[in-house]
Amino acid sequence: MSKEVIVESFELDHTIVKAPYVRLIGEETGPKGDIISNYDIRLVQPNEDSIPTAGLHTIEHLLAKLIRTRIDGMIDCSPFGCRTGFHMIMWGRHTSAKIAAVIKDSLKEIAETTTWEDVPGTTIESCGNYKDHSLFSAKEWARLILEQGISDDAFERHVI
């Protein structure tokens, strides 16, 4: 017998969410009581737009560093294949508002002050597709997302 598997993100009605937003997908408790939280960091409206691969790749590398300087406990922040945002996995519990503030502050740094020298992992030794980066695209998308504001609610706009 095969186990029935439900993937939450495929159950989400992508036609009713209002990006940009941060949404707590769920929490899991490990055998020793540790809590892991999974967040939907949706930066662009699903099925209306997507971030080009090179820009998204650069945002990914920058968020890997910038989020960790702003909050403890980040395990991973990986882009969705649809290129509309990221899954972020964290140790512990954090409100969507707290995570949204961290993302907003990180995107602000990308848009305003980041230089090519600030982007980690852009060499052949440190990245599996090191030629596929665009700081210009990352900065432009960060500005567009910040102009719209980041909500801590996926279904009602509550910009932080």
Swiss-Prot record:
Q: Known EC number(s)?
A: 4.4.1.21
Which keywords does this Swiss-Prot/TrEMBL entry list? Autoinducer synthesis, Iron, Lyase, Metal-binding, Quorum sensing
Q: Which reaction does it catalyse?
A: S-(5-deoxy-D-ribos-5-yl)-L-homocysteine = (S)-4,5-dihydroxypentane-2,3-dione + L-homocysteine
Record has Lyase as a keyword: yes
Q: Which positions in this protein are listed as binding Fe cation?
A: H57, H61, C127
State the needed cofactors, names only.
Answer: Fe cation
- Please tell me which top-level EC class this enzyme sits in: lyase
The UniProt GO MF terms for this protein read: iron ion binding; S-ribosylhomocysteine lyase activity
Say which family it is in.
Belongs to the LuxS family.
What name is this protein filed under?
S-ribosylhomocysteine lyase
